[in-house]
Structure formats: C-alpha cells, structure tokens
Amino acid sequence: MIGFFTQLFARAEPVLSEAGARDTAAIAALHAASFRRGWSEQEVEGLLLDRQVLAHRALLRGKLTAFIMSRLAADEAEILSVAVAARSQGHGLARKLLNLHLRRLAGLGARAVFLEVDEHNTAAIRLYNRAGFREVARRPNYYPDAGGKPAAALVLRRDLA
C-alpha cells in the first residue's frame, strides 16, 4: 500500500525529445499562455516544417509542458522561443531542455547561439546566464509593456565551439 501512495505522489520525470508537426496545437497553446502575443497554429506549423528550425519538447505525464525552438543559419543559431507551463516552472525543466537543445545545435554545426530576452524577465536571464550566455547588445523600447513603458530586449550570445 505504501508503494501505491509513493508512486501516486512521486514527481514524474519529463520526457525530452524533438518536437514535430504533431505538436503544433500544444506548442501554440503554450506559447499563447506564456507571451503577450502568442504564435498562431499556422505560425507554429510553418516553423516546425522549416528545415532550418530545430525544436524540442518536454512531455510530463504525456502532456506537452515545455518547448524550445531555434532557427539555424550557417554556423549560428537563434533561439526563437522557450516556454514552460506555469505549473512546471521552478523545477529545472527549462535548464534540462536548454542543455539538450544546445548540444543538438552544436551537433548540427552551430558555433554560436543568440537570443533576445525582456530585460524584466529575471528568471529567464538567470537561466541563460547560468547556461553561459552573455549580453552582447541591448535594444531599447523593444517589448511592449502592459503598463505603457516598453522594455528593452537584451541580446545574449553563447559560443558553442
């Protein structure tokens, strides 16, 4: 009986894998829940079908709970988006997904990875700094703010080679 309760309340481990067109609706829904302007299913599908785009997902109990997506160009990649469902944040899932994704990008020949992040998104900035990203530029007034004052985008870079 104790084994039953242990299994029932145990924290499930996420399953990390490449994302594909089958994940379009779930990625679009998670993106919409995570960002002020979410991607439509058509936008997500277009990205997932693009041969220069790499995407990974995290499934928790069979449900998509996080994703990361990048576009490759020559020997560089740009992380287009990272999202983790609110209920799954704070447990290291984004770190695991980011590390897997960076290894795969390196395996595909990317020597440097770039991304943009809202200057007020401290959790994401902390994640990226811990993963070895460093600020290389700042775009003032880039992100619209609900309070009327736009936020800067920090441009971060990490060398893979």
What are these language model-derived features?
Residues 98, 121-124, 141-147:
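Short glycine/proline-centered loop/turn elements that form peptide/ligand docking sites
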Residues 96, 126, 154:
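Active-site phosphate/pyrophosphate-handling residues
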Residues 16, 117:
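Conserved SAM-binding loop
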Residues 2-3, 114-116, 129, 134-151, ...:
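Conserved catalytic-core motifs of GNAT/GCN5-like acyltransferases
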Residues 2-12, 18-91, 95-108, 157-161:
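Acetyl-CoA-dependent GNAT
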Residues 84, 118-119:
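Short amphipathic helical patch at the helix-1/turn junction of helix-turn-helix
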Residues 37, 111, 149:
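Flexible coil/turn residues that form the inter-helical turn or adjacent wing/linker of helix-turn-helix
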